[in-house]
Swiss-Prot record:
Transmembrane segments: none annotated. The keyword Transcription does not apply. One of its GO terms (molecular function) is rRNA (guanine-N2-)-methyltransferase activity. The keyword Ubl conjugation does not apply. This is Ribosomal RNA small subunit methyltransferase J. It catalyses: guanosine(1516) in 16S rRNA + S-adenosyl-L-methionine = N(2)-methylguanosine(1516) in 16S rRNA + S-adenosyl-L-homocysteine + H(+). S-adenosyl-L-methionine binds at R109, D110, E125, R126, D179. It is an enzyme of class 2 (transferase).
Length: 261
């Protein structure tokens, strides 16, 4: 997105006790701390952490990252474990927990699922505010005795995924996972609410073919791309096979078999 179309935001402390934390976030994100009557979004700092609120009468409510309670906790406890389609897509099997690079981390939901299954997950998020929400959520998760071991398997990097993958230093991830932004067809209230935040801030991933190319060059074993079930494949090489669910599809680009150990 260009600066001319970027939405206006300001940072707001929800209590006097959070004023200093709000000041630090405003400085880090380069956003004004004072109230802005023309702001479209408020970055709010409260006792329960960081959240973003779309302002105006039709606001869907705040969006935050919470790995301890809510949807993530429910999926961790009742989501089907290694039988979930995402687990099959990345190659989770008995004795096999691949190292995963989630190159389009967003709010970290899929990365958290993989980490909860025992995978070491590196998350990359290019939009600084979304990355801040994710950082805040991981920090709070690290203080919870039940979730801290999962959060410890998640490492967050900020920046452009394609650039980071091209300049990767060290052991390559076995699996690169991509979930590019697209016009969502998911009708759930949660996804609608998050899309109203994401789309103005992030826009669609028009660089998905470049992401796929960089992922295929880096991953040692496979690349997995999550798509809407009826969406075309990303421009470039064709996937080896796909796993299809009710609303989503996982296109798998295998390079070599994952082994135990």
């Amino acid at each position: 997105m260009t600066d001319s179309t970027a939405p206006r935001l300001h940072v707001q402390a929800l209590s006097a006790d959070c004023a200093e934390a709000a000041r630090r976030w405003a400085e880090r994100l380069g956003l004004p701390l004072a109230a802005d009557d023309e702001a479209e979004f408020a970055v709010q700092v409260g006792e329960e952490g960081l959240q973003v609120l779309q302002l105006g009468p039709d606001s869907p409510g705040p969006v935050r990252v919470d790995f301890v309670e809510g949807a993530s906790a429910h999926r961790r406890k009742f989501g089907g474990g290694s039988g979930q389609m995402i687990a099959k897509a990345v190659g989770v099997q008995p004795g096999i927990r691949p190292r995963v690079l989630d190159a389009t981390a967003g709010l970290g939901r899929d990365g958290f699922v993989l980490a909860s299954l025992g995978c070491e997950v590196t998350l990359v998020e290019r939009q600084p505010l979304i990355a801040a929400l994710l950082e805040d959520g991981l920090e709070r998760a690290g203080r919870d005795p039940d979730v801290a071991p999962i959060a410890a398997r998640m490492r967050l990097l900020g920046g452009n995924s394609a650039d980071l993958m091209r300049a990767w230093d060290g052991e390559a991830p076995q699996v690169v996972y991509l979930d590019p932004m697209f016009p969502h067809r998911d009708k759930s209230a949660l996804v609608k609410k998050e899309m109203r935040l994401f789309r103005p801030l992030v826009g669609d991933d028009l660089d998905a073919p470049a992401l796929l190319q960089a992922a295929l060059a880096l991953a040692s074993h496979r690349v997995v791309v999550k798509r809407p079930r009826k969406a075309p494949i990303i421009e470039g090489p064709k996937p080896g096979y796909s796993l299809e669910g009710k609303s989503s599809r996982y296109d798998i680009y295998p390079k070599k078999a994952l082994g135990k150990g």
